């Protein structure tokens, strides 16, 4: 009976993940043609924001300088100007196509994120009872573990999320989210988030250890500090 009670919430959690992903994927595929038509036919703006426009201008200037240098080296001065104009025209078209596809991808991702959030909200509201059962099952499972295993899991989790090697993972994750919402890649902003966000998590986690675990299981705190040292 207990296994059945635990199985139902797990099945419900699996259905949440699978259905939200499948519905979001289907929505993205069905909306792709509409977004492409809307962006290419009815949208007059080339860039989504000023940051992207500045980034495109910098790439265009860099491209123009490289093509100019390449033509100056390969050809004589009397014919390189015409080839330079043709090369700049071709590369400009490719640059515009690249940004155009990127904007469509950003809009689709933004709409998909909204749909995913709405689906998860509906599942949370309708299946609150199942989630409560799952939460109690997880709490019971963790409670039955020994203090040594608990300390090991806590140490492993903290090293993965806020440990010495975690900034590399945070940089990839924040950069992916940053790009997913249509922002141009900015090393300064991403580095700032990577350097501050894990520190905030580390502070919160240490506070929870001091406030909660020290009250519930003092031996676990002692084992954790012994392993950590």
Curated annotation (Swiss-Prot):
The answer to keyword Amino-acid biosynthesis applying to this record is no
Q: Mind telling me which GO cellular component terms the entry cites?
A: chloroplast inner membrane
Q: Which residues form the signal peptide?
A: none
Species annotation? Ranunculus macranthus
* Source domain of life: Eukaryota
Reactions catalysed according to its record: K(+)(in) + H(+)(out) = K(+)(out) + H(+)(in)
Q: Which gene encodes it?
A: cemA
Its annotated compartments are: Plastid, Chloroplast inner membrane
Q: What does this protein do?
A: Contributes to K(+)/H(+) antiport activity by supporting proton efflux to control proton extrusion and homeostasis in chloroplasts in a light-dependent manner to modulate photosynthesis. Prevents excessive induction of non-photochemical quenching (NPQ) under continuous-light conditions. Indirectly promotes efficient inorganic carbon uptake into chloroplasts.
What biological-process GO terms show up in the record? potassium ion transport
Q: Where does this protein chiefly localize?
A: plastid
Which protein, by its recorded name, is this? Potassium/proton antiporter CemA
The UniProt similarity line reads: Belongs to the CemA family.
The record's section on Pfam families has: CemA
Q: How does it sit in the membrane?
A: Multi-pass membrane protein
Enumerate the transmembrane spans: 7-27, 107-127, 154-174, 189-209
Task: Show the HAMAP family listed in the entry.
Answer: CemA_PxcA
Assigned keywords, A-Z: Antiport, Chloroplast, Hydrogen ion transport, Ion transport, Membrane, Plastid, Plastid inner membrane, Potassium, Potassium transport, Transmembrane, Transmembrane helix, Transport
Q: Which residues form a coiled coil?
A: none
Entry GO MF terms: antiporter activity; proton transmembrane transporter activity
């Amino acid at each position: 009976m207990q296994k059945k009670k635990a199985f139902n919430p797990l099945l419900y959690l699996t259905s949440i993940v699978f259905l939200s992903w499948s519905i979001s994927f289907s929505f993205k595929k069905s909306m792709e043609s509409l977004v492409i038509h809307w962006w290419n036919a009815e949208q007059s703006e080339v860039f989504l924001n000023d940051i992207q426009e500045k980034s495109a201008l910098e790439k265009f200037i860099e491209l123009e300088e490289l093509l100019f240098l390449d033509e100056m080296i390969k050809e004589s001065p009397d014919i390189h100007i015409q080839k330079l104009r043709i090369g700049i025209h071709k590369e400009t078209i490719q640059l515009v196509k690249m940004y155009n596809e990127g904007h469509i991808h950003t809009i689709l991702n933004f709409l998909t994120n909204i749909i995913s959030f709405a689906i998860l909200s509906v599942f949370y509201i309708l299946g609150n009872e199942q989630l409560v059962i799952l939460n109690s099952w997880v709490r019971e499972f963790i409670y039955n573990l020994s203090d040594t295993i608990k300390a090991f899991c806590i140490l492993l989790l903290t090293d993965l999320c806020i440990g010495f090697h975690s900034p590399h993972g945070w940089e990839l994750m924040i950069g992916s989210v940053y790009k997913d919402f249509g922002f141009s890649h900015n090393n300064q902003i991403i580095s700032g988030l990577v350097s501050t966000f894990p520190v905030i998590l580390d502070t919160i986690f240490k506070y929870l250890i001091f406030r909660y675990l020290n009250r519930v299981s003092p031996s676990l705190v002692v084992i954790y500090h012994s392993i950590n040292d």
